Amino acid sequence: MGIFKSIVALFTSVVMFFGTVWNAGISAVNSYSFTVDTSELGDVLVNPASNVNIWSIQGNPFVGVKINEENNIFEFVDYIQLMQCTGGNADRDLFKDPYDRTVLDDYDFTKLIENCRGIIGLGAKPMLKLGSVPLKYSAKASEDEYFGTNVYPPDDYDVYYNYIAAIAQALVDEFGKEEVLSWRFGVMTEFENSQWFMAVSGDPDESAVEYCKLYDYTVQALIDVIGEDVFVGAHAMVVTEGLWDERAFINHCASGTNYKTGEKGSRICYLAASFYDYSPGEETSGMNFEKTMKHLKNAAEKAGLKGLIFGVDEGRLLCGNTRGSSDNQLLTRTVGYTYQAAYDARIYRTMFNNNINYFSSWSFLSGGLINGNPTVSYHVASNAAKFDGAKLAETKKTYRALFPNIEVDAVSAYNEETQTVHVMAYNYKNDVDYKNTAKINFTLKVPQFDCEKVRVTAYVIDDDCNYFDEWQEDRVTYGIGDDCFDWSPDDPEIGSTTTLSAQWAREIYFNELEAKYKECSKLEPVVSEAEVKNGKVKLDIKLDPKAVVFYEITQVK
């Protein structure tokens, strides 16, 4: 026994020694080098943060709403996605009496029209998710399903077609055909998710047929009223298995027989997926983000569909690491910690490198979609949006530290019109408590520049522009425990009662803290100049853990 104890003690000492050396080593030599070459250009990039989504228009969230001038998300958000806005329960069904099955055409589109008008007034365009079938159109309909909406197809597809056509006509009458043609339309949310839609039988194959039929009737109603150029598509789960394989629908659009017209195929302009990791530190049980999107794109390419755009209609993180009084879900599907900045940056890098059009967000501000202080997600999104119109530039990692589970990476682009080089880099580990700085060196080869100096504008997104670390300290000071929250306290939308629910704590937040956090969340650029030597520009930075840096580099003449 004595020998055994001695061996254990020796082993423990060795482990502790090397653990100390390992951690010290990371801090000392966590170094990376990148080469950017703007003579090697690829695809034209688009703004990856152009979409936001909202769960419901109940309560008219866009009627009479004014732009937040200080933190205006509509400087980069182009579309507001209204999820399942034309059916599924009494709040979403657009009728005078959603429960009266004796009258099937007592339409009342006032709520939809007024909210669309409000969205346009904010400088954005509506993206309307259609497809959920009104209660009175399905004999088996129930509001007791998982999402509180009817999951079954219509009993009579012609009645449903007339409803969608009437909605389209009302929108054209109110806003004009040219305006509505600039909007986007979708048919269902996660169409192969049985919690959103399925056949009455629940059979996978029958459910696929019913959805394809629903899609065809919906799209044709839009075409017949708005025109053949209407922008319409569909949103699948993809990241995890649904009731049936989404490729059945993709193949139907490419070469199947249209259930409404009898012709070959169906109009489709975009395909979207959902992508959720479970929580910080726990990735999805399904495909990672890049594999999810490649799966969707490959399926469309194999089916022969061309010219589509690909996006993500909802996602990021389902749950936080701490639980509120009733749930650990994240209201905005993001956390307030600076970890989220690097998480978002690596998503945008994947999008730029794989020609993914957009990743829709639930919120960018502490008070909801329109109001409040900027989160780190806002700062990353607003800077990533500046890549819009630039061409992807060759970015090579020429040196990297050999430490596991740490991801330090970069992406760059060159805008030929503005003659600007854009670079984004991040220091990420899938751990909210990650604590190691990364030393990053860049060598930029920009033959387009004919100058001796360049102006470098750097935006560093770290704890210094994040109110959430101060919020954690203030929670301790004021005794605001996890039981003061309904859902996860890790969510940055403190202004929502779904997040911070205790009234006494809300009074402290709004009366004493929110104004202070305005200063804590400001992102100030740092402007400097760098020399051009032998056609190259060299930059370096020590990037804090979980932080992100954006560079904008222009000529000084």
In which residue ranges do the predicted regions lie?
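Sec-dependent signal peptide recognition
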Residues: 2-13
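Mature N-terminal, pre-catalytic/accessory segment of carbohydrate-active enzymes
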Residues: 16, 20-67, 545
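Conserved beta-strand positions
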Residues: 52-54, 82, 187, 234-235, ...
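Acidic-and-aromatic substrate-binding clefts and catalytic sites of carbohydrate-active enzymes
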Residues: 53-67, 104-109, 193-197, 237-251, ...
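Substrate-binding cleft and catalytic face of glycoside hydrolase catalytic domains
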Residues: 75-282
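Catalytic-core region of carbohydrate-active enzymes that cleave or remodel glycosidic bonds
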Residues: 278-367, 372-388, 416, 431, ...
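Carbohydrate-binding surface patches
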Residues: 403-483, 487-492, 546-549
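C-terminal beta-strand-rich structural cap/linker in extracellular carbohydrate-active enzymes
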Residues: 481-557
